[in-house]
């Protein structure tokens, strides 16, 4: 698995237990067993990694979503599946990233 994705998965898992603002690059890299320089080779900071997570979230079902109701159901199911991660993001300085992700999912549906 690529280092970026290992770091992303570790961050998502950690955010289910610890607030994002309490997670340091050092703690994250120790969990992934990579050094800090490796993290900074790929990312500027934790929020840069968080951006990658939201940009790369798999949403294959979205291509099949045809209306607003289906979009809302999709968002709800996504939230249930990723509750710890989403709640931690919404209660942190990364709140705007989660809001933008939800906005983009809705926007793509409304353009159809």
Where are each of the predicted segments found?
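Phosphate-binding site recognition
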Residues: 25, 36, 60, 80-83, ...
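Basic, helix-initiating cap at the start of DNA-binding domains
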Residues: 1-18, 27
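DNA major-groove recognition helix of helix-turn-helix
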Residues: 7, 11, 43, 50, ...
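Amphipathic alpha-helical packing segments from all-alpha helical-bundle domains
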Residues: 70, 74-77, 95-112
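HTH DNA-binding helix-turn interface
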Residues: 16-20, 33-50
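A short secondary-structure junction motif
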Residues: 53-57, 82, 86, 105-112
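Append "Primarily bacterial transcriptional regulators
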Residues: 7, 26-31, 39, 79
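Amphipathic alpha-helical linker/stalk segments
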Residues: 16, 23, 53-75, 86-87
């Amino acid at each position: 698995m690529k280092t970026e994705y290992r770091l992303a998965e570790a961050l998502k898992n950690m955010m289910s237990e610890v607030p994002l603002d309490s997670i340091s690059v050092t703690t994250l890299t120790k969990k992934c067993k990579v050094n800090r320089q490796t993290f900074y080779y790929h990312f500027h900071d934790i929020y840069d990694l968080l951006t990658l997570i939201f940009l790369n979230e798999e949403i294959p079902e979205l291509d099949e979503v045809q209306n607003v109701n289906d979009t809302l159901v999709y968002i709800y199911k996504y939230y249930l599946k990723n509750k710890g991660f989403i709640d931690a993001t919404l209660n942190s300085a990364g709140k705007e990233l989660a809001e933008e992700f939800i906005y983009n999912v809705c926007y793509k549906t409304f353009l159809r």
